[in-house]
Each structure stands twice: as C-alpha cells, then as structure tokens.
Amino acid sequence: MSDFEDNVPDDLEGRGYEEREEEGLDSFDSSVRIEISRLSLFTHHGVTDAEQEAGQRLVFDIAFEVEDCDATVTDRVEDTVDYGAVCQAVALIATERSYRTLERLCTAVADMIEERFRAANVIVRATKPEPPIPLPVEEVSVEVER
C-alpha cells in the first residue's frame, strides 16, 4: 500500500458500481461540469452576403453540466458525455448552414447540446477573432446561456 492509501480514512472508502447496482441505486447523484475551450472552425456566417461567401474563423467556448454522471465512480466513458462527439456536433451545426447572427448560431448549438447530450446549464460563446468592423477591434463575442 502507498503512503497515500495508508492515510485515507475508512469513511472515505466508497461502494463500487456493482454494489450500488445490486442495491438498486441507479446513479451516483454526482454532477460534473464539462468545458470545451477554443474550438476553432472555419465557417460562413455573417450579416452580409460577402461575409458569408468569404468565410471566417470562429472560436467556440462551451460549458455544460451533466447530472448524475456515473463516470465519476465507474471511470467508464459510456457513463459520461463524449467530448469529441460534442465537438463534432458543434462543427456540423457551425458548417452545415449560414447564420446571419452569432446569437442564432449560439442558440442552435446550445439547443443541440441540451437535447442530444442531455446537458444542463449550457453556455455557448462564439468569438469572431477578426470581425469585419472598420475600427480597431480585436474580437467580438456572443454568449448564450440555457
């Protein structure tokens, strides 16, 4: 046994997944917050037709909660949300059609994450690193919360 294991109090030892299943306990009542930072995609969104045709890079920051996340105990990927699948789904929404506003795009992404991944407290931020504004602006962002 390691020094760490020797110092763990007995009352911190948890029951395993199998023991909880035998007792009829379906979940571990543990929620987790998942954050995806700086997902960069080339898209065709914008107010003007020219902006949509030329396309531009958008950067997404996404956060959401997964209620009753059994993976906190089971360590099984199938007991949580696959982050890669979330990124692929966001990429599909962001590239399959054009939106005039970032507000609508962020809403579409947030709605999809809520529905497809059964997530709660979803926050989606889309950032235009080089907005077509004739003033010295580094970036613009829109954030939608669900």
Whereabouts are the PLM-identified features?
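N-terminal, polar/charged subdomain of small-to-medium soluble alpha/beta proteins
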Residues: 2-146
